[in-house]
Amino acid sequence: MPGLMDMHVHFGQEYKSKAERPIKIERETEAILATAHADITLKSGFTTVRQVGDSGFVSISLRDAIADGSVDGPRIFTSGKSIATTGGHADPTNGKSIDDYDHPTPEQGVINGPYEAYTAVRQRYKDGADGIKLTVTGGVLSVAKSGDNPQFTLEEAKAVVSAAKDYGMWVAVHAHGPQGMKRAVIAGVDSVEHLSLIHISEPTRQSP
């Protein structure tokens, strides 16, 4: 049997009940969890995975450590840190007092407008990511107010895709709500994850 592939993993996270799950884990803990989960994944028969979103450089460092034989794990293709809009699903400051943090920048994964979208993609390229992860709608495992509303404009999504293609990077999007999915497909992303509330009655894009 050939090695299996998993196209959506988050090695640095451990899913427990909502009551037990911390809102944020420390980077050191994330690195330990990611290394352990990579080893378990390889032993389970998966030889290639796509890591779609973490808190920073953990998956990039893990990918390189596996590649040079320092630790055991599958081959990893990673987006590094996700890209969100202010208050969106992957905004790391959601649920915190404005007195406790500075507004996150595109380099830190939060954008507003096409110009900042280009900045965020170029930073991911500089960081060593293989692709881009956008959170184009709300989600379940965050403290964003909505789980399905669109959180990127079409122009922002198109800017991300355009910049990513310039650097040979794929674009995967987290999407639960139909409007965000539609914008992502029109923008030309490579994959749409989750699709929880997809509407199949209205075609978004037809193959030639």
Regions found by a protein language model. Name each.
Residues L33-S59, G73-S82, A129-S142, W170, ...:
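Divalent metal-dependent hydrolysis catalytic cores, especially in the metallo-beta-lactamase
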Residues P2-S70, T86-A90, E155, I186-A187:
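Metal-associated gating/positioning segment near the N- to mid-region
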Residues E30-A38, G113-Q123, H176-G180:
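Short, acidic/polar
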Residues D64, D68-P74, S79-K81, D148-V173:
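Alpha-helix-loop-beta-strand connector modules within alpha/beta enzyme cores
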Residues H199-P208:
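Single conserved hydrophobic/aromatic residue that forms the stacking wall/gate
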Residues P2-Q13, A164, V171-P178, V192:
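Histidine-centered catalytic micro-motifs
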Residues Q13, S17-E20, D72-E107:
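Metal-cofactor-binding active-site regions of metalloenzymes
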Residues E20-I32, Y101-T119, W170:
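Active-site mouth loops of central-metabolism enzymes
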